[in-house]
C-alpha cells in the first residue's frame, strides 16, 4: 500500500514537472498572444464579462490562478482591482512581471502550485483562472483549494475548454483539437501527450465542473458556452465555456 502511494506521488510529481517544462518553453510565444489580446477586442470582451460577473463590485481582492504571462492579472489591475497572481512556471512569471511593468500596473506575483495554495482561508473576493484546470493532475483538489481561499460570498470565475476530450468522445476528433499559436519553434507534441493523459480529457465539461462545485457547497453555479460546434445531426459540441460560482 505504501509502495503504491509512493509510486502515485512520484508519477504525479514527474507529470507536474513535465507540464512546467513545456510551459517554460512556451512563455515567450504565449506572451505575444496575451499582448495581442490586451490590445484588441479580447480585452473589451473580458472587461465586460468580469464586470458583469462581479455585479458592480469595485476594487476587490483578486487571485489569478495560473496567470501565465499575466493577461487577467494586467486586465484586472487596470480595472482598479488588487491582484495577486500565481503560476507554477518560472518563465511565465518572468513574462508576467514584464507585462505588468509594460502596462504600468501593480500585481503581486508568486510561484505556486494551483492545486496547493499557500494562502489563508477566506482571503479573496474573486478567484479567476483561464485555460488552467484542464492542465492539472488533481482538478477536483484545485477547485477545493480555490473555494477555500474565497471569502464567503466570493466569486469563482473559471474559463476553460474541452481541449482533449476527443480522447473520450470520437465526435470531438479533429473538430476540437487545440490550435496552438505563437509556438516560436516549440513542438506541441509533449503537451498533447500530457493533455491526453490528464483527468479532464475524460470528463465532459462544464457538466463535470457544475457537479463538483455544487458538491463543494457553492450557493450558485452558472455556466456559459462561449464556443461550440453544431453537427449536421443537430448535436452540439461544447468547446469553450465560462463558469461562475458563488461561495
For every predicted segment, state its role:
Residues 161-233:
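C-terminal alpha-helical "lid/dimerization" subdomain adjacent to the S-adenosyl-L-methionine
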Amino acid at each position: 500500500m505504501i509502495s503504491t502511494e509512493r509510486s502515485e506521488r512520484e508519477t504525479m510529481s514527474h507529470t507536474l514537472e513535465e507540464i512546467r517544462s513545456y510551459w517554460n518553453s512556451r512563455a515567450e510565444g504565449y506572451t505575444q498572444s496575451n499582448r495581442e489580446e490586451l490590445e484588441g477586442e479580447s480585452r473589451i470582451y473580458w472587461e465586460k464579462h468580469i464586470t458583469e460577473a462581479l455585479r458592480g463590485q469595485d476594487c476587490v481582492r483578486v487571485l489569478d490562478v495560473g496567470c501565465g504571462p499575466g493577461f487577467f492579472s494586467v486586465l484586472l489591475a487596470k480595472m482598479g482591482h488588487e491582484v495577486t497572481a500565481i503560476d507554477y512556471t518560472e518563465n511565465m512569471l518572468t513574462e508576467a512581471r514584464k507585462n505588468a511593468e509594460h502596462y504600468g500596473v501593480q500585481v503581486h506575483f508568486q510561484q505556486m502550485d494551483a492545486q496547493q495554495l499557500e494562502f489563508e482561508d477566506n482571503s479573496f473576493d474573486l478567484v479567476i483562472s483561464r485555460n488552467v484546470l484542464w492542465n492539472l493532475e488533481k482538478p477536483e483538489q484545485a477547485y477545493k483549494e480555490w473555494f477555500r481561499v474565497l471569502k464567503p460570498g466570493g466569486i469563482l470565475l473559471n474559463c476553460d475548454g474541452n481541449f482533449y476530450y476527443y480522447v473520450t468522445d470520437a465526435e470531438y476528433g479533429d473538430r476540437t483539437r487545440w490550435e496552438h499559436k505563437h509556438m516560436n519553434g516549440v513542438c506541441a507534441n509533449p503537451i498533447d501527450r500530457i493533455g491526453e493523459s490528464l483527468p479532464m480529457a475524460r470528463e465532459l465539461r462544464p457538466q463535470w465542473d457544475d457537479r463538483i462545485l455544487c458538491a463543494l457547497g457553492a450557493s450558485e453555479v452558472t455556466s456559459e458556452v462561449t464556443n461550440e460546434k453544431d453537427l449536421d445531426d443537430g448535436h452540439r459540441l461544447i468547446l469553450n465555456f465560462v463558469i461562475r460560482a458563488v461561495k
